[in-house]
């Protein structure tokens, strides 16, 4: 995917800004940040007023790029940074942007086949990180999320996220 002779994986992170480039205006050394997984060249219609996730230059940091988060220091674009939510731990802060971006891309990233109000969506693993984001995106978009869980004690959590219904997969012998 890239031509560098090395690869540092990892697409989700939170941390403290250690250094900034000369053109960076919004961030300074010492800022506590969350790093979003999207990188792009910033020079097309989708990056400038559209949806950068649909940019032809869009790539996932640490997966399609050589420099990811599994390092002591990570190199990112300034537009990848978000202020770290103070009510979340460092670990909690690090994990939500990747699963949110992944769920968003699954539901809205295949034009013209995108999620619309009234659509029914089966969300397998609805109580996990990716599934819980998918349920919330469905609810926010007016779609009907039906969550699939593996334990009955997860039902209420998924319903509180906005699911219209929940199926416990252990109540069924066959999904074929």
Locations of the language-model features?
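Glycine-rich beta-strand-centered segment in the early N-terminal region that forms part
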Residues: 1-48, 67, 80, 85-88
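N-terminal Rossmann-fold NAD(P) dinucleotide-binding loop
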Residues: 10, 131-132
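Phosphate-binding beta-alpha-beta segment of Rossmann-like dinucleotide-binding domains, i.e.
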Residues: 40-67, 114
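A glycine-rich, Thr/Ser-enriched phosphate-binding loop motif common to dinucleotide/cofactor-binding enzymes
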Residues: 64-70, 86-111, 124-127, 133
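A short glycine-rich beta-alpha junction/loop motif
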Residues: 73-81
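Phosphate-coordination loops involved in phosphoryl transfer and adenosine-cofactor binding
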Residues: 117-119
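Adenosine-nucleotide cofactor-binding segment
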Residues: 123, 139-176
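Surface-exposed amphipathic alpha-helices with a cationic face
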Residues: 132-140
């Amino acid at each position: 995917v890239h031509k560098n002779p090395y690869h540092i994986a990892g697409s989700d992170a939170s941390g403290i800004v250690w250094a900034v480039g000369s053109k960076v205006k919004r961030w300074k050394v010492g800022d506590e940040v969350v790093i979003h997984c999207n990188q792009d060249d910033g020079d097309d219609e989708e990056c400038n007023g559209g949806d950068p996730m649909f940019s032809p230059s869009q790539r996932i940091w640490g997966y399609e790029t050589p420099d990811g988060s599994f390092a002591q220091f990570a190199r990112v674009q300034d537009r990848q940074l978000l202020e770290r939510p103070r009510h979340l731990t460092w670990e909690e802060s690090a994990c939500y942007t990747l699963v949110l971006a992944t769920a968003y891309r699954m539901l809205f990233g295949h034009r013209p086949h995108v999620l619309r109000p009234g659509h029914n969506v089966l969300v397998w693993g609805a109580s996990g990180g990716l599934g819980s984001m998918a349920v919330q995106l469905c609810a926010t978009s007016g779609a009907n999320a039906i969550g699939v869980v593996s334990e009955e004690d997860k039902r209420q959590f998924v319903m509180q996220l906005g699911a219209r219904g929940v199926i416990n997969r252990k109540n069924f012998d066959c999904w074929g």
